[in-house]
């Protein structure tokens, strides 16, 4: 087998912004904590045949390092402290942390082990690699132009629907969340460039590389792993979500204040999200469950606490496309501020192409299991039934069908 000597990932910054934001917090607070993360394919795909190509690409990532220009760019941002940046300047990927194998039925398995401060950066480029390797092999005829043509059609429909429903788009805000399951690097670059130049409602991208290259705002706060890890960091399981929320404020007291709500369901989150947290965090992010029901709960919670919802923001990011975003915008507009993060349906929305439904999630921290009890049962991650039961009881979460 002849392997392509050209690396797909060519920049440390070709990742989601929240990975660097979380990495800095981990570096400062939990530097030596060991974790394990694992790959999941949520569909019936047989991806084992791509293991050798993936291994080759992962090995080439050992050569990546921050350029002087990238270092200067990160220094110019208000989020990062100098001690972290000096450490990150010398950061190198360690391919030996990534264990890639194939099962008897041709499933791809990926397991990442090591210190959290290092493992944290593997998820996004690994998923982008799997996606691009598979799509290159299956659909070599597809170009970035195909994706841009489709995007223009979707935007035309978006404008037409908004006009027909007399929706004022003045407050519509879009963010690109498309790195991890993009068709390819070239497609994401073309899509973000098209949006920047022709869609006035784009406010930023979650990808630091494209943010730097295209002078866009980098966007992102924290992911499920932040809350999951605290399940085995916090001395008391029932207090772990509050510990995660507080630790984030300790690192970022007055910025990056969007909290993710569905690591242990929205209802359990809101029980912990009391006045001190609700007043300090700028808003909430939706990533599973019914988005309208979720948004109504968020607004009601703010109102119950005496907080004006229009002083807060809801970020919707669960399987969004332009049509879903417009429905949500119409429903919540002028009741609370809104931002829409669209990912796969921006960067892998091409006729006759099926995006991969793949994730990499934390499964262990400090040698013990962690779990995610999503608002969508199919997105629940569990490795240990006994721990899931403990977590459910600690947070008073009803038993739901698990997807392990």
Curated annotation (Swiss-Prot):
Keywords: Ligase, Phosphoprotein, Pyridine nucleotide biosynthesis. Signal peptide: none annotated. The keyword Nucleus does not apply. The modification Phosphohistidine is found at residue 224. PANTHER family: NICOTINATE PHOSPHORIBOSYLTRANSFERASE. GO terms for molecular function: nicotinate phosphoribosyltransferase activity. This is Nicotinate phosphoribosyltransferase. Belongs to the NAPRTase family.
């Amino acid at each position: 087998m002849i392997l392509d000597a050209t690396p797909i990932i060519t920049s440390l910054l070709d990742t989601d912004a929240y990975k660097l934001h979380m990495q800095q917090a981990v570096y400062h607070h939990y530097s030596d904590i060991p974790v394990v993360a694992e790959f999941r394919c949520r569909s019936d795909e047989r991806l084992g045949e791509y293991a050798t190509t993936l291994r080759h690409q992962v090995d080439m990532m050992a050569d990546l390092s921050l350029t002087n220009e990238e270092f200067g760019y990160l220094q110019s941002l208000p989020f990062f402290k100098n001690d972290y940046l000096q450490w990150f300047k010398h950061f190198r990927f360690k391919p030996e942390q990534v264990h890639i194998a194939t099962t008897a039925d041709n499933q791809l398995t990926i397991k990442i082990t090591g210190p959290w401060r290092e493992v944290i950066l593997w998820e996004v480029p690994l998923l982008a690699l799997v996606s691009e390797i598979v799509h290159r092999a299956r659909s070599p005829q597809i170009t970035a132009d195909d994706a841009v043509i489709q995007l223009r059609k979707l935007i035309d429909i978006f404008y037409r629907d908004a006009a027909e429903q007399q929706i004022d788009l003045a407050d519509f805000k879009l963010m690109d969340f498309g790195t991890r399951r993009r068709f390819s690097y070239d497609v994401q670059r073309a899509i973000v460039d098209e949006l920047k130049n022709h869609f006035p409602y784009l406010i930023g991208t979650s990808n630091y590389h494209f943010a730097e290259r295209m002078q866009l705002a980098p966007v992102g706060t924290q992911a499920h792993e932040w809350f999951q890890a605290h399940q085995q960091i916090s001395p008391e399981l029932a207090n772990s979500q509050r510990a995660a929320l507080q630790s984030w404020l300790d690192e970022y007291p007055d910025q990056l204040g969007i909290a993710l709500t569905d690591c242990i369901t929205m209802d359990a989150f809101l029980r912990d999200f009391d006045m001190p947290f609700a007043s300090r965090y700028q808003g909430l992010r939706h990533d599973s469950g019914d988005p309208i029901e979720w948004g109504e709960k968020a607004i009601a919670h703010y109102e119950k606490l005496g907080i004006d919802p229009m002083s807060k923001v809801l970020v919707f990011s669960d399987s969004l496309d332009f049509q879903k975003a417009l429905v949500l915008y119409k429903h919540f507009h002028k009741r609370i501020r809104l931002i829409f993060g669209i990912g796969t349906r921006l960067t892998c929305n091409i006729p006759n192409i099926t995006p991969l439904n793949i994730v990499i999630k934390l499964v262990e921290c400090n040698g013990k299991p962690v779990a995610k009890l999503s608002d969508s049962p199919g997105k629940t991650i569990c490795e240990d039934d006994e721990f899931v039961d403990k977590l459910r009881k600690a947070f008073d979460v009803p038993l739901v069908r698990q997807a392990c």
